[in-house]
Structure formats: C-alpha cells, structure tokens
C-alpha cells in the first residue's frame, strides 16, 4: 500500500514580473519523491498577473526492510528514527514476515481446504509410522481390533492437535503485538527489557495487518482446535466403552469366539470342577483326555504345567506368560 500526503504551500502574490522555476520537496519514502514547480508570467506591466501551479509526483517501489521502511513528511513530528530503538527482529511487522516464511507457521495462511488436507496427510503419516506400532504393543489387533484402532487414532490425533496448538500460539503472539499500541522489547538480553510506544503511523499500519491478515488465521485455528478437541473427547469415551461394544458386536454377529467358553462351562459341569482346580491338575490330565481338554481351555490355550513349578521347570517354561512365571 502506498500512501501519499501532499501539503499545498501558500504561494504569495507577486507584484512584479515573475519568471522563475524552483522546486520544493514535499515528502518522500526512501525511494519515492514528490516535486512541486511553480512560476509566474506577465504580458504587460500594470496588467493583472497570472500564477500557475504544477505538481509532478514520482513514486517507485519501497525497498525498506521487510516492507517497513521509514517515511518522512514535512509538517509531521515522526521521523524514520522512531523504530530504530527496537531491534529489527523484535519489530511486529518483521515478526509477521518471519512467521509467514516459517515451514510450519506458513500453514496458517493457506485456505481452509488446503489446510485441512495437509492436516489429514500429517495425521495419516503419523498414524502409520508411530500410532500403529505403539498401539500394537499394547493391544492385540486380532482380539481387540476396536481398542487397537481407537488407541492408534486417538494418540495420533492428540499429536496433530499439539501441532495445531503450536501454530495457533505463534500467530496469536504476533497478532497481539501488531494490535497493541505499546510493546515490550529487549535491547540485548532479558535483563534490559524496555517498552516502546508506537507512533501513530506505525500503529495504524500494524493494526491494519493484524485485523486483515492475522485475525482470520487465528479464527480458523480456533475452530480447528475446537473440532479436534471434540473428536478427542469422543474417541476417549468410545475407548473406555470399547470392551462392552466389542462384546455386543460379537454377540450380535454370532461369532464363534464364545464357543470355547461354552465348552469350558459344559466340561466343568460334567466333572463338577472349578476353573481354579482344572488349572492345578498337572498329573491327572495325563490319563484323561477330556479333563486335559478342559484344563487346556481353562488355561486359555496354554500348557497346564505353567501353573506348576516342578513341571514348568521340567518343560523349560515354554508358552508360559509372565504372570504364571512369577507365581
């Protein structure tokens, strides 16, 4: 945006013949100029004199640092040195430029569709590389598929939410500094903090950037955080009730996974033996096949010798779980 303020000086009346050319500098950016030329002519002595005024303006692109070049106008108290006291990297307009060039923070200036496409791609890559291996170490995908998928998806969504939160905090910080009339800065370190009051021209420029460039980004990031938060809460609640849901689906679909439990109960009723007693029959199961089958089902498919220290040591402890070994 190029702003030009022209002050028209009062040209005094000339009582004698005027034939002169002069130029006066009104105001300029560092790379622009405005020149006014004036002169008078008279045909005959005693006649009414005429005076003409011509203004020629030349403006080129401002080549100041990061679009924040200083300006100088006659009749105004602000001069280019008003921003010199603040280090270049701590000026809000330069912080905004650095934010736009950042690899991650630049996502904020994308359109909503492209922004959500990138978030979806990030979620998919994180889910494949990190979420699935971690969830598989905690939940068996074949026995607990619902809890496995929920654990992997919820963990990945949480990481993506943290990244969106980091982007939001960066844009919110720069937006506050652009909209504020007084900002803190440090001359050389944390121990010499100062406060800088923005001149009116700088404040108008910064608030224009903050209102039309930063606020829409912050609004979109807020909506994204609210959406991811709602998804996280829903996934967590579903994860808590995942086991009852899995049991419901197994019962509804009539899966055959419940048949071993039925056979265990029938065999237990046949021998009138409890499950705890079936697990402590390392000797009797040698001669009774039905009793051995019931004991194997009660042990969840593991060898019965896992519950006996002597036979476990004799067999080498193969196929035994850790809770069996510590007992």
UniProtKB/Swiss-Prot annotation:
It is a multi-pass membrane protein. It is found in: Membrane; Plastid, Chloroplast. Mostly expressed in seeds, leaves and flowers, and, to a lower extent, in roots. This is Protein CONSERVED IN THE GREEN LINEAGE AND DIATOMS 27, chloroplastic. Its main location: membrane. Keywords: Chloroplast, Membrane, Plastid, Transit peptide, Transmembrane, Transmembrane helix. PANTHER family: PROTEIN CONSERVED IN THE GREEN LINEAGE AND DIATOMS 27, CHLOROPLASTIC, PTHR34214. Residues 66-88 are annotated as: Disordered. InterPro entries: CGLD27-like. The keyword Transit peptide applies. It comes from Arabidopsis thaliana. The gene is CGLD27.
């Amino acid at each position: 945006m190029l702003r030009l303020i022209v002050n028209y000086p009062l040209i005094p009346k000339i009582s004698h013949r005027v034939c002169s050319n002069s130029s006066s500098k009104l105001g300029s950016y560092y790379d622009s100029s405005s020149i006014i030329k004036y002169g008078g002519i008279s045909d005959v002595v005693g006649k009414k004199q005429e005076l003409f005024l011509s203004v020629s303006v030349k403006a080129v692109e401002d080549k100041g640092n990061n679009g924040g070049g200083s300006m100088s106008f006659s009749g105004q108290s602000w001069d280019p040195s008003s921003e010199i006291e603040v280090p270049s990297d701590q000026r809000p307009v330069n912080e905004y430029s650095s934010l736009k060039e950042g690899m991650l923070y630049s996502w904020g200036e994308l359109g909503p569709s492209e922004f959500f496409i990138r978030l979806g791609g990030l979620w998919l890559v994180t889910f494949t590389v990190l979420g699935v291996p971690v969830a598989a170490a905690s939940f068996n995908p074949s026995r607990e598929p619902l809890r496995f998928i929920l654990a992997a998806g919820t963990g990945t969504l949480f990481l993506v939410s943290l990244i969106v939160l980091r982007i939001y905090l960066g844009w919110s910080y720069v937006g506050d500094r652009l909209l504020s009339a007084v900002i803190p800065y440090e001359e050389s370190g944390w121990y010499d903090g100062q406060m800088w009051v923005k001149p009116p021209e700088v404040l108008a420029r910064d608030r224009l950037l903050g209102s039309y460039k930063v606020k829409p980004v912050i609004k979109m990031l807020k909506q994204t955080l609210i959406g991811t938060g709602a998804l996280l809460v829903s996934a967590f609640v579903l994860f808590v009730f995942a086991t009852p849901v899995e049991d419901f689906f197994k019962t509804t679909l009539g899966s055959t996974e419940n048949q071993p439990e039925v056979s265990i109960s029938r065999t237990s009723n046949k021998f009138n033996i409890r499950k705890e007693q079936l697990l402590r029959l390392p000797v009797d199961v040698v001669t009774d096949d039905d009793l051995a089958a019931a004991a194997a089902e009660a042990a969840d498919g593991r060898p019965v010798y896992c519950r006996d220290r002597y036979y476990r040591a004799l067999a080498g402890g193969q196929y035994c779980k850790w809770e069996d070994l510590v007992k």
